[in-house]
Every structure is written in C-alpha cells, then in structure tokens.
C-alpha cells in the first residue's frame, strides 16, 4: 500500500450575510472547508515524500472560490483560500514529483447542493429550480460524473500541476480564463 492519488472533496455550505455572521460559524466553515483539506494534504505529502514516487493531490475548490454568491461568504471564503493554497502545494512539491490540482465546479447535486438548498438558491435568484440548475452558457445541468471525469483527467495528466479545471457548463463570472 501507499498513497499516490488523493481526492479531497469535503465541504458544507454555511450561509448568512458576512457582516452579520457569527464568528463561530465562519471558523466552523474554515475548519471543514479549508483546514480539513490542509490536514489531508499534509499527511499525504509526508507519505508521498517518503515513498519518493511522486503523486497527485486533487481538491474541489468550487466556483465560490472565484464567484461568490449572496449570503454564501462563509462557504466561499475558505474555498477562495483553498484555490491559492492548491497552487502553493504545487509550487512547493513539484520538485518531488508531487502535483496539486483543483476542480472549480458549480451547481452539482450533492450532499452540499441538496434539494432544499437548490430551492433556496433558485428562489434567491428568482428562477425555477430547473433554470437554476441549467443556468450556464450551455444551458445544461452539470452532473457529478462530469466532475469525476475532471478529477480523472487531472490525475492522468502527469505533466500538469497548479491547474484549476472549471466544470460548470460555462459561467463567465466564475471563469478563470
């Protein structure tokens, strides 16, 4: 056994106006949405360096990292920090053959984007749930399999590091291009 690929995808969506948010809530969000990934990465890097065969760290940073949503700052702030943090891991560990990449996904039905949250976010935007889920340039709902394929692509690209792959059907506001 050993570690050659890590996909870190933990997260939860704390909500509230940032100026009114209890500090405890923001700290809880950072603990899960940033520091849990840091703990995973530190331990994976330690093992990967001992193995001396390289490896890849893959993280879900979310579109919130580059395009914040109303009353969603508690979730978006740690994701924005994670975006730069992934690149820092790439910078500091490339010499060991260890790559670090991220996926910037949006509106994926999951444990975070639950039916209740879809209802809340679509109401906040004044659109139907279907229109909310297809609210991108392609007019197509992005599925969990689409995100999984992006992670697989990043894992297989042995000469790619510090990459952020966007999987959102086309959201110009969240585009890194």
Question: Where are the regions a protein language model picked out?
Answer:
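Conserved Rossmann-fold SDR core element
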Residues: 2, 83, 93-113, 138, ...
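Active-site loop of short-chain dehydrogenase/reductase
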Residues: 2-3, 48-62, 95-98, 163
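Catalytic Tyr-X3-Lys loop
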Residues: 12, 19-39, 58, 82
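Active-site loop-to-helix junction immediately N-terminal to the catalytic Tyr of the SDR YXXXK motif
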Residues: 21, 68-77, 88
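Active-site helix of classical SDR
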Residues: 41, 78
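Alpha-helical segment proximal to the catalytic Tyr-Lys
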Residues: 46, 91-92
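A glycine/serine/threonine-rich, flexible loop-to-helix segment
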Residues: 95, 108-135, 177
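C-terminal substrate-recognition "lid" of short-chain dehydrogenase/reductases
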Residues: 140-167, 172
């Amino acid at each position: 056994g050993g570690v050659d690929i890590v996909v870190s995808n933990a997260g939860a969506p704390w909500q509230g106006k940032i100026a009114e948010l209890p500090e405890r809530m923001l700290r809880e969000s950072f603990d899960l949405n940033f520091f849990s990934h840091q703990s995973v990465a530190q331990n994976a890097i330690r093992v990967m360096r001992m193995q001396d065969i390289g490896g890849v760290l893959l993280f879900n940073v979310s579109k919130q990292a580059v395009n914040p949503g109303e009353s969603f700052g508690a979730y978006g702030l740690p994701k924005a920090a994670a975006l730069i943090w992934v690149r820092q891991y790439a910078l500091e560990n490339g010499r060991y053959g260890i790559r670090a990449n991220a996926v910037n996904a949006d509106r994926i039905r999951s444990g975070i984007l639950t039916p209740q949250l879809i209802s809340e976010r679509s109401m906040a935007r004044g659109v139907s749930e279907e229109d909310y889920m297809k609210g991108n340039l392609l007019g197509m709902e992005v599925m969990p399999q689409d995100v999984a394929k992006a992670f697989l692509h990043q894992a297989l690209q042995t000469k790619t590091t510090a990459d952020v792959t966007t999987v959102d059907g086309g959201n110009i506001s969240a585009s890194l291009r």
